[in-house]
Amino acid sequence: MVMTNGKLILLRHGQSAWNASNQFTGWVDVDLTTIGEAEAKRGGELLVENNVLPDVVYTSLLRRAIRTANLALDAADRHWIPVVRDWRLNERHYGALQGLNKAETKDKYGDEQYMAWRRSYGTPPPELADDAEYSQAGDVRYKDLESVPRTECLKDVVERFIPYFEEEILPRVKKGENVLIAAHGNSLRALVKHLDNISDDDIAELNIPTGIPLVYEITPEGTVVNPGGTYLDPEAAAAGAAAVANQGGK
């Protein structure tokens, strides 16, 4: 039996309400904007145009990623395939920064501290109190967790997501399946860091645009054929990544 390579399709959710208002979102369950809905649909259309149709979808427990998956699948006429939702694909928890405006936070704490919280590998923001407005401490969807995070750095996301990827998702890709992961900027940065062996320092420079599929081809042995992945709309991806990099400006 000849084994074929599988495709791992990474799709960051479309623009959310707090992307549009330049706020730290983390685990706060905000919805997509109309622009974000259109981005998600376009992501699905790109899958069809490039003949990269998913067999299964993995997403987080946050509606912006779930709805992005649903809209993309509908546009690709793959609404019928299995969808697996797991908290380990959630966005990074931004701690006490959740809900704060990025530009105002940058002005208050300075560029160096702002970038350390936002882009360093091992520096988490201050913890969010359990009784704070944007805490998830009492959220029923996390009732089976031993404890809900109060803050996270990217290293924490790597430690919760990559073992799940290795155990649950990668084996399907190695069997030749096309697997769509509809998730978040930082959960996808954690995965790309792992796939491309990006250093702890260099990962600060990686930005994932919204709504544009990034495809990795993976052999049955688990080798990435195209390091760095292939965006299905490279021009839009470059512009989108630049916009993400500039968040925090006026």
Curated annotation (Swiss-Prot):
Source taxon at top rank: Bacteria
Protein residues bound to substrate: 12-19, 25-26, 64, 91-94, 102, 118-119, 185-186
Pathway: Carbohydrate degradation; glycolysis; pyruvate from D-glyceraldehyde 3-phosphate: step 3/5
Active site: 13, 91
EC number(s) on file: 5.4.2.11
Gene Ontology molecular function: phosphoglycerate mutase activity
Keywords of this entry: Gluconeogenesis, Glycolysis, Isomerase
Site residues by UniProt (Transition state stabilizer): 184
Catalytic activity: (2R)-2-phosphoglycerate = (2R)-3-phosphoglycerate
InterPro entries listed in its UniProt record: His_Pase_superF_clade-1, His_PPase_superfam, PG/BPGM_mutase_AS, Phosphogly_mut1
Enzyme's top EC category: isomerase
BP-aspect Gene Ontology terms: gluconeogenesis; glycolytic process
Its job: Catalyzes the interconversion of 2-phosphoglycerate and 3-phosphoglycerate.
Family: Belongs to the phosphoglycerate mutase family. BPG-dependent PGAM subfamily.
Protein name: 2,3-bisphosphoglycerate-dependent phosphoglycerate mutase
Source species: Corynebacterium efficiens (strain DSM 44549 / YS-314 / AJ 12310 / JCM 11189 / NBRC 100395)
Phylogenetic classification of the source organism: Bacteria, Bacillati, Actinomycetota, Actinomycetes, Mycobacteriales
This protein's encoding gene: gpmA
